[in-house]
């Protein structure tokens, strides 16, 4: 993997790790789907100057626009929608464990849809990284797993499949159109699809933007600019430079980074599990890169 792709992925993973802390701050006064809507709107505004400078839709035909719209659904509305709905019916522990299947999903989908080879080293690397994430979670989280509401579990798994499809099809479109163009259109179209969803949630819960605290606005601004704009752009830059399987495994670096950020910002304890698990994740990523 080129050094540029590796740096892009590590930066994106770090920003997404911080996003969990920022999201917790935002959710104190803002409903979840409205948080998603606002962060995507802010991210879309970051891309608008480029869209105008590039000549708007003159540079892209309607067929491509339709493909980008479908891609935006996988990465925004469908992904966030099924994830949020699933969390209403299943436990957070179940959801966190299911997220470890993300890179495995990407590994399988990229083999079927893109023809990328699943080598022995790649497979072992992903499994080692999975083990690392499970160690970071710890026995308390794993032991709290329960076969509760199947509906919720299936919805969370569906959200993971959506992100896998987003990554695989995003890789294909990035190769054809370039990272900046794909990320810009996916973000803008995703924001457009989230507006009615966020508005419906706000109306149902009686939420008003005036209820949002200054700290929550700062968190949402960070989520929009750093996480939805910059991190997603870097993710697509990496997809344009490397195989989606090798890119996907970097998602396993997010849980250890999140734990470190939580320790620094929220005062949570850095445990032996975190250290050992992080070493396994790094080893797994290294194996997959060389696969």
Q: What feature does the model see in each segment?
A:
Residues 34-45, 75, 80-126, 159, ...:
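Specific alpha-helical transmembrane segments that line the substrate/conduction pathway
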């Amino acid at each position: 993997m080129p050094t540029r792709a590796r740096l892009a992925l590590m930066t994106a993973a770090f920003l997404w790790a911080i996003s969990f802390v920022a999201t917790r701050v935002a959710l104190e006064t803002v409903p979840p789907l409205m948080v998603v809507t606002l962060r995507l709107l802010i991210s879309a505004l970051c891309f608008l100057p480029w869209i105008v400078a590039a000549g708007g839709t003159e540079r892209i035909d309607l067929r491509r626009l339709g493909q980008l719209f479908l891609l935006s659904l996988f990465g925004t509305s469908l992904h966030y929608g099924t994830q949020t709905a699933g969390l209403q019916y299943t436990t957070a522990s179940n959801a966190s464990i299911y997220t470890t299947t993300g890179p495995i999903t990407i590994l399988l989908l990229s083999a079927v849809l893109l023809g990328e080879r699943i080598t022995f080293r790649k497979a072992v690397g992903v499994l080692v990284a999975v083990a690392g994430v499970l160690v970071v979670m710890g026995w308390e989280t794993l032991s709290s797993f329960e076969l509760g509401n199947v509906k919720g579990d299936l919805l969370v798994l569906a959200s993971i499949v959506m992100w896998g499809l987003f990554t695989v099809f995003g890789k294909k479109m990035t190769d054809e159109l370039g990272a900046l163009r794909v990320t810009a259109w996916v973000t803008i179209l995703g924001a457009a699809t989230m507006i009615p969803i966020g508005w419906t949630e706000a109306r149902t819960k009686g939420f008003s933007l005036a209820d949002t605290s200054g700290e929550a606005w700062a968190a949402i601004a960070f989520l929009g600019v750093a996480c939805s704009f910059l991190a997603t752009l870097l993710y697509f830059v990496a997809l344009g430079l490397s195989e989606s399987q090798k890119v996907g495994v970097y998602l396993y670096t997010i849980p250890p980074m999140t734990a470190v950020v939580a320790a620094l910002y929220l005062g949570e304890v850095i445990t032996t599990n975190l250290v050992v698990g992080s070493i396994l994740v790094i080893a797994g990523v290294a194996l997959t890169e060389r696969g």
